Amino acid sequence: MTIAEWRQRLNNREISSLELVNEQFARIKDVDNKLHAFLKLEEDSARENAKRIDEARLSGKELPPLAGIPFAIKDNLCTKGVKTTCSSKMLESFVPPYESTVTQRLWEAGAILLGKTNLDEFAMGSSTETSAFGATSNPWDLSRVPGGSSGGSAAAVASGLCLAALGSDTGGSIRQPASFCGVVGLKPTYGRVSRWGLVAFASSLDQVGPFTTSVEDAAEVLQVIAGKDPLDSTCLDKPVPNFSEYFSDSIKGLRIGLIKECFEQEGISLEVKESVLKAANQLQSLGAELIDVSCPRFNDGIATYYVIAPSEASANLARYDGVKYGYRQHGEENLSAMTSLSRAKGFGSEVQRRILIGTYALSAGYFDAYYKKAQKVRTLISRDFANSFEKVDLLLTPTSPSTAFKAGSHDNDPLAMYLSDLLTIPVNLAGLPAISVPCGFDKEGLPIGLQLIGDVLGEQRLLQVAHHYEQAANVMGNCPKGDLIPA
């Protein structure tokens, strides 16, 4: 069911907000011991807020659009008075004194916080295995990863533990887990949504977006969280349009570009490629025109990203030293030793690896050879996209080269892990909006994701085409429920 359908049930008093919240917590208790999607539940406050909304509804008060709708929030978004750990020992006890802009907008719209979801430590990972508090499993197959870094949010939505969730996307961290878990994941244009209160990984790449079970719901959540924020200087001062305005309009005549560099990649699974091309043909049958386009530097995205993102991370994470807050190693003789050991024990191996890479790339003697060069390539990648959008309205690729891989299978091969974001990273480098929509299954019954990429601030068109595909392909609601999670 969509958020609109749940809202109708609530307004018709077929179910109360409290009953809906209680149903969600009952389901979480039934299955999350197997999934580990949540790090922390907010049961008391959720029930109190649900009762308050029920009372307002009974009194006939006009309610905001998400009144009574249960949400989960990735645990790198600050929630005032609620622990925000980034799945790191470094922030294990951190309780923010302020609310992130996106969560504040959700609560003002009536949404209810069920809890905080698991992620790769400081959002650095593609499998939700680097969490200091244990890995999350994929609800379609518990032996596989849910993707990352927002794997907890994706798994929670896919298994019906919440109606929607927020995640963050730095190089594919919403879209790749959405693909692996068979849900919708939307990364807005950089600056469309405020980053205030999002614990920074790579500030020029991070963006907040929703996980939902339908494109319609993704549009509705974006409607609430988008818009100018004086607390975030990178947030665009642009009008927020009606993101579902074009849903009823035909897509006949729209030009959709197939990026040939993506489909020529040797590392892409044949089943993934076939499923995505079938989805492209479905869009063609709806009247869209398919055009082959070239983004010559698309495949340089991985190398570029793994210079820029770690460089920004090394600067952003320098503040965690055990002095003012964060994990502190006691018993050391001096400040330098305490800081060094606090960081060594507070950060996991993947975070340490990226800090080292970033520090090296920014160091004197290597800045020009690595960081400066990567920024130049980033500009060229953005230019390739801009050239493509002179010929087409949207771009189409697989979301990920493969379906969900086995947990632990990439432990000793960081490069293989990094390559799982091969098709999503260039979008972040260019600051473009993109969405992952389920488009089929492989022979093992694992979901495959279709990625649609829009031009800057092109979310309306992006969501329109994704919605038309979703309706025509009848993929909405193909999510695992209790029967797909072994007892």
UniProtKB/Swiss-Prot annotation:
SUPFAM superfamilies: Amidase signature (AS) enzymes. The keyword Ligase applies. Keywords: ATP-binding, Ligase, Nucleotide-binding, Protein biosynthesis. The keyword Zinc-finger does not apply. Coiled coil: none annotated. One of its GO terms (biological process) is translation. It catalyses: L-glutamyl-tRNA(Gln) + L-glutamine + ATP + H2O = L-glutaminyl-tRNA(Gln) + L-glutamate + ADP + phosphate + H(+). Heterotrimer of A, B and C subunits. Allows the formation of correctly charged Gln-tRNA(Gln) through the transamidation of misacylated Glu-tRNA(Gln) in organisms which lack glutaminyl-tRNA synthetase. The reaction takes place in the presence of glutamine and ATP through an activated gamma-phospho-Glu-tRNA(Gln). Belongs to the amidase family. GatA subfamily. This is Glutamyl-tRNA(Gln) amidotransferase subunit A.
